[in-house]
A protein has these predicted regions:
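A glycine-rich dinucleotide-binding beta-alpha-beta segment and adjacent secondary-structure elements
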Residues: 49-51, 62-66, 186-190, 215-226, ...
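Conserved redox-cofactor binding core of oxidoreductases
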Residues: 42, 109-230, 234-238, 299-325
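Glycine-rich loop(s) and the adjacent beta-strand/alpha-helix scaffold that form part
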Residues: 27, 31, 38-43, 223, ...
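FAD cofactor-binding and catalytic pocket of flavoenzymes
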Residues: 301-380
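N-terminal glycine-rich phosphate/pyrophosphate-binding loop and immediately adjacent elements
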Residues: 1-126, 284-285, 295-297, 301-304
Length: 380
């Protein structure tokens, strides 16, 4: 069977892949094939914001990775949920819209990466965004990604913000604006009571384009190479190995784990690692698969009565959630429009720290080990 040929082949229909496919196919003369290992984003758990609590701790639309034992964590393993569906992790996460601090981007540029300063990337953030709350120099209107406050406003949110103020963290309505530090309600990627994932924002409106082909359940096996040039991607689908070719570029947007893994499977990486795994070395590139950095969550839980407007395991909580599910199904309103994580704060660990280095996430429920461990009752 002859391989189909496109101008661009994109591996991974996550946040980057969906946006890339949409932008590239704005030109009707450019053809794109987008490969996704997961399935279509049809599940109600994706579209109902509260469905995050069912997907993150399980393998529903989720790779649910475990790390190897970490020396810095006394040998413990870390849990790494990652989306496996159209939209990638934007289809299973808590939908919090949080940009990096200005310092982060300026630091990247200072390290020798032109085009990555805050002033360089801000117009791109604005172009992609439609913010229902803020229309100023820091936010966009009319973009595909809808950003708003959560429709369901639990009274418990106000208690968190009051507690933050008492402890010296003032209210900052827009942490994505001029100043990051402060306490706030999270801005979220919701639209009309549903999750606004990268797939829903960028991909779904453009699926009818004749120059865009989306292939789901396509597990990429390797990048095909001719000499030092990437020419396509071999992938498994339905038990068969297939190949798609690229005239211009092969773009890997399979995530922090998926992209380096595919490079290594293609023979691109540290020669010693590839030889140990029995992979022929095509290009000795020692940095592939190294230097992953991620933040760590420290979870603290406080018990609250079951009548509190929170999520929990109790008769009262179950009855409340059942009613909320019916309300959401009919009207796209109510408790199920909550991302569970509702408020937060950025602050400095010490007065002499230049930028906020600590982040708080306030959750309307007991979240132990990414909700993989359930507890009776209610808490925050």
């Amino acid at each position: 069977m002859n391989a189909q040929t496109f101008d661009y082949v994109i591996v991974g229909a996550g946040s980057a892949g969906c946006a890339l496919a949409a932008r590239l196919t704005e030109d009707p003369n450019v053809t794109v094939c987008l490969l996704e290992a997961g399935g279509p984003d049809k599940s109600v758990l994706i579209h109902a914001p509260a469905g995050v609590v069912a997907m993150v701790p399980t393998r529903i639309n989720n790779y649910a990775y475990e790390t190897v034992p970490q020396p810095g964590l006394n040998g413990r393993k870390g849990y790494q949920p990652r989306g496996k569906t159209l939209g990638g992790s934007s289809s299973i996460n808590a939908m919090l819209y949080v940009r990096g601090n200005r310092w982060d981007y300026d630091h990247w540029a200072a390290l020798g990466n032109p085009g990555w300063s805050y002033d360089d990337v801000l117009p791109l953030f604005k172009r992609s965004e439609h913010n229902e709350q803020f229309a100023d120099d820091f936010h966009g209107q009319g973009g595909p990604l809808n950003v708003t406050y959560q429709a369901h406003q639990s009274p418990v949110n106000d208690l968190f913000l009051q507690a933050a103020a008492v402890n010296g963290i003032p209210l900052n309505p827009d942490y994505n604006g001029a100043e990051q530090a402060g306490a706030f309600q999270y801005q979220v990627t919701h639209k009309n009571g549903e999750r606004c994932s990268a797939a829903k924002a960028f991909l779904t409106p453009n699926l009818s384009r004749p120059n865009l082909k989306v292939v789901t359940h396509a597990v990429s096996a390797k990048v095909t190479l001719e000499g030092r040039r990437a020419t396509g991607v071999a992938y498994h689908q339905g038990g068969a190995l297939q190949t798609v070719r690229a005239r211009r570029e092969v773009i890997l947007s399979a995530g922090a784990f998926g992209s380096p893994q595919l490079l290594q499977l293609s023979g691109i990486g540290a020669a010693a690692d590839l030889q140990k795994a029995g992979v022929p070395v095509m290009h000795d590139l020692p940095g592939v698969g190294k230097n992953l950095q991620d933040h760590i969550d420290y979870v603290q839980t406080w018990r609250v009565p079951s009548h509190t407007d929170t999520f929990g395991v109790s008769l009262r909580g179950s009855a409340r959630l059942t009613g909320a599910m019916l309300e959401w199904k009919k009207q796209r309103t109510g408790m199920v429009t909550s991302s569970i994580a509702t408020c937060g704060a950025f602050f400095r660990s010490a007065p002499d720290v230049a930028v906020p280095d600590l982040q708080l996430v306030f959750v309307l429920g007991i979240v132990d080990d990414h909700a993989r461990k359930l507890h009776l009752g209610h808490g925050i």
